């Protein structure tokens, strides 16, 4: 068994001692000593879910969840139904954070959970899983690389690593589950990462869901744990359950067929390809291969490929232009007007396409707008406020409000600007 200290040292130079278990308040169920405890435990640092059939006599897989704002309960609830059904312990951090000035914040958050998991539960040290969203998705992959051979899978939502795929090249014991909302501003980044995984022959899945930059719904999160269980069988981490594998294959073939019949050809092809990768050779896999090949010969599928390629190119172009536009705005001697900034960002055209475009162009425009909104309503105003440039910060927030009403962090930044530099004319407002 690998000691706590060995695992901890591999995830950062900072060393500390924590006694987490004593802080947990138990409310029902059974703990490792067979005493009355909770299946949903909570401490100051994390929430825990333990399956009701937990028994310390065997080893259990565990999922560590890193929410980008430390919303432990929200994130844990998404995985809880599948964790109960499939037998996963889930720990969800209250200390994880994206966009932090502290580079070690997620190292500490993860190590806190890792220490507690080894101290308090009987876990399978070869079946550690990590789930992250946005910036914490990138952290999850980096931790998996450092703990290769221990981390058996990563759920990466709404963001992707810039590398790391070759650390797991041809590794059947590792699984990469990627997901993104259809209007997520990091949508293309997530797709590109799975292409790199495919090239490196890393087992992967890619799922899209309706919505913006966010955690997926419960069914997608549960699907990730189901797939991890399947990959654990295929990778030799657990004994193969032929009945469960056959049942899972049945459901996936039915789902792929349903996607095709509803006109979701690209989704059907993607699932058929995943089926072909994830199951041992059998006559039923030939069904998937033939069905996928038939779709790929259809003219409408070829047209879809061409159009999505064009839209991806446009997305990439905008992602490269946006920093240059921001640089122009920040360095102009006279603060550019809201109209001038909006024109450079092509907001009028993008807003029109987002409401009047077709099923491909509308989501593509919404993704670009979402990326622009994140920059104008959070990242850049925060930086400008730190630099004391309140006029430019307010102007950026004004343009952001043309994309969508200011909420949450955008409102907090606007209030900070107005507090430190009261507006002398009409200013943007919060919804």
Question: Predicted segments — roles?
Answer:
Residues 62, 66-119:
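Active-site machinery of serine-nucleophile hydrolases
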């Amino acid at each position: 068994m690998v000691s706590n200290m060995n695992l901890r040292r591999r995830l950062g130079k900072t060393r500390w001692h924590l006694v987490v278990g004593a802080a947990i308040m138990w409310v029902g169920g059974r703990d490792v000593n067979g005493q009355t405890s909770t299946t949903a435990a909570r401490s100051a640092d994390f929430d825990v879910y333990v399956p009701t059939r937990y028994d310390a006599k065997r080893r259990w897989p565990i999922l560590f969840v890193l929410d980008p704002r430390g919303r432990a309960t929200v994130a844990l609830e998404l995985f809880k139904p599948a964790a109960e059904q499939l037998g996963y312990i889930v720990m969800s951090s209250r200390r994880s954070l994206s966009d932090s000035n502290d580079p070690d914040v997620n190292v500490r958050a993860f190590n806190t959970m890792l220490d507690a998991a080894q101290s308090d539960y009987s876990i399978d040290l070869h079946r550690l899983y990590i789930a992250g969203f946005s910036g914490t998705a990138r952290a999850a992959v980096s931790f998996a690389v450092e703990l290769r051979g221990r981390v058996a899978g990563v759920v990466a939502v709404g963001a992707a690593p810039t590398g790391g795929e070759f650390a797991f090249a041809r590794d059947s014991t590792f699984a990469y589950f990627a997901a993104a909302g259809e209007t997520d501003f990091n949508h293309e980044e997530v797709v590109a990462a799975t292409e790199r995984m495919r090239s490196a022959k890393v087992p992967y899945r890619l799922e899209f869901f309706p919505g913006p930059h966010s955690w997926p719904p419960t069914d997608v999160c549960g699907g990730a744990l189901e797939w991890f269980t399947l990959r654990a069988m295929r990778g030799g981490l657990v004994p193969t359950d032929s009945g469960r594998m056959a049942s899972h294959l049945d459901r996936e073939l039915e789902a792929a067929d349903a996607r095709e019949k509803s006109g979701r050809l690209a989704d059907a092809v993607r699932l058929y390809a995943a089926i072909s990768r994830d199951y041992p050779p059998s006559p039923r896999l030939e069904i998937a291969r033939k069905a996928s090949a038939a779709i790929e010969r259809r003219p409408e599928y070829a047209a879809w490929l061409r159009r999505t390629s064009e839209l991806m190119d446009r997305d990439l172009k905008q992602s490269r232009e946006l920093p240059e536009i921001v640089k122009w705005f920040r360095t102009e001697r006279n603060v550019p007007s809201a109209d001038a900034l909006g024109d450079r960002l092509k907001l009028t055209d993008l807003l029109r396409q987002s409401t009047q475009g077709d099923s491909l162009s509308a989501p593509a425009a919404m993704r670009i707008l979402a990326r622009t909104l994140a920059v104008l309503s959070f990242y850049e105003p925060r930086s400008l406020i730190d630099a004391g440039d309140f006029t430019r910060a307010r102007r950026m927030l004004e343009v952001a409000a043309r994309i969508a009403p200011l909420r949450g962090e955008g409102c907090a930044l606007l209030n900070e600007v107005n507090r430190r530099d009261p507006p002398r004319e009409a200013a943007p407002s919060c919804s």
